[in-house]
Every structure is written in C-alpha cells, then in structure tokens.
C-alpha cells in the first residue's frame, strides 16, 4: 500500500513509518518539520503538513491508499499562556475529524487513528478532564466517518516506550541520563502508582494489523504490560547498572502529576482483549527489551 503517516517525524509515527516500510509498503511521512537529513526518517518521502490547518490538497491526499494519523495533540502542544480547553477543541475535537473527512473525500480507502487509551480504559476521566474529553470526541468523530468505501479504525494506546534510529526523544534521553546519575543532586526515586505500557514496536505492529484487518468503525484498546512506576524507572536504572530507586510519594520532575491524569498513587491497569490482540497481531512482554534499547541509544 501507499501509506501517508501524519506525525511521521515523531516517535510513534516515525517508528510506524520505518516498520511499515520494512514490511514492503510505500511510505510517505507528513508533518510541520522535515526529519533530519542522514537519518532513516530523513530518507523517506516527506510532505509538509499542518493537519489543524487542513493544508494538504485533495490531489496530494488522493495519491495514497491509506492514512495513519499519529499527530494528536497532548499537553506538550499547548501554546504557552494559551487557553487549554480552546486548544483541545480546535486541535483534537475539530481538527482531527476534519482532516479524516478530507482524506475520505480525496479517495483514501483505509485509515488508522492512533488515539489515547484514557477514554476506553478510564472513561470517567473524560467527564472532568478537557484533554481526555477532546481525545474521546476526536476518536468518535473519526470513526463516525466510516463508510463502505472508507474503512477507519482507532488504535488507542497507553504510555508508549520506544526509540527510533536517528531521532532524539528528549523524554527518554532524560530518563537514561537520570538512571545513570546525570541529574545529581536530584534524588533517585519513583512516584507511587502505575499504568499500562506498550512498546513502539508493539504499537507499530498493531497499526499495521489495523490497516490490513481492522474492523470498520472499531476502537481497539491496545496495551502490553502493567507496571508500577518503580518497575518502569527501575528498568532504566538496572540497565544503567544502578539500584532500583525507592518509591517516594511526591511529584517527580520527569513524570509530573500533570502527566498522570488518573492521579499520582493510583494505578490504571487493564488486560487488552485477547481476540483483538490476535487480530492486530502485536507482540507482548516487550517493555524491558525496549528500555534496554533506549538506554543503549542514549548511553
């Protein structure tokens, strides 16, 4: 298939782009910024695109068989001093379905929306959290566009852990530096609580599965391992050759309370549906391998 990946210069979309290319697909990535030259992502075809502005012409979109959308806005994308609720409305609630509608109208036949796990794993949070509500409405708006000629599904992922050759992901570089003692005198600790994690590799496999076999209009809650945050931080520390950090009930600079929408000290665990996991064809128990890969990249 000829596949357009919006957000393909980021970690999730970039990993999916390289995975899909390795599987024999013809891949073009789209985003606001071109990937660095001399990197694997820099070697892919690139379209400059701001999906919120819906600035790709029908002729450009219509050149593709399939769309993967991995550019949903989260807390990292709110303009400084901006109105968060208004941003979520414009970027997610309005912008994402509008872009999918343009893709459908241009003749793309298959689309996968990479969304957030929160609306399915903890739907109650959408009642009071404007960000989660925006991801829920974006997901529902995208899937409502399904027709016999436009097969669309969502792959809704938890916390994603991964690495892409040639791409610096500041969060994972910071985790690695922290585990190696590079943030001293900042104390070594992990916050209480835990969540489901998935590797970028597992997610890329799920995206491919949804492209090939996804049920029209379906939202798939994907996931891999339920880990405490101590387990998660501990994996980085062990690979760096240092002891697992203790749990301290205070906000962590590298995992702030704003990033734990279900509340520090709580857990958000679940087991993905076995039949859906088999249909999408993604691997499990991949987090420790992935953390080792991350630490090796940034060490």
What annotation goes with each model-predicted range?
Residues 162-175, 210-220:
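Glycine/proline-rich active-site loop of Rossmann-fold NAD(P)-dependent oxidoreductases
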Residues 3-23:
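N-terminal Rossmann NAD(P)H-binding glycine-rich loop of SDR-like oxidoreductase domains
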Residues 176-198:
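A conserved pocket-lining segment of Rossmann-fold NAD(P)-dependent short-chain dehydrogenase/reductase
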Residues 194, 201-262, 278-299:
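Mid/C-terminal beta-alpha module of Rossmann-like enzyme folds, strongest
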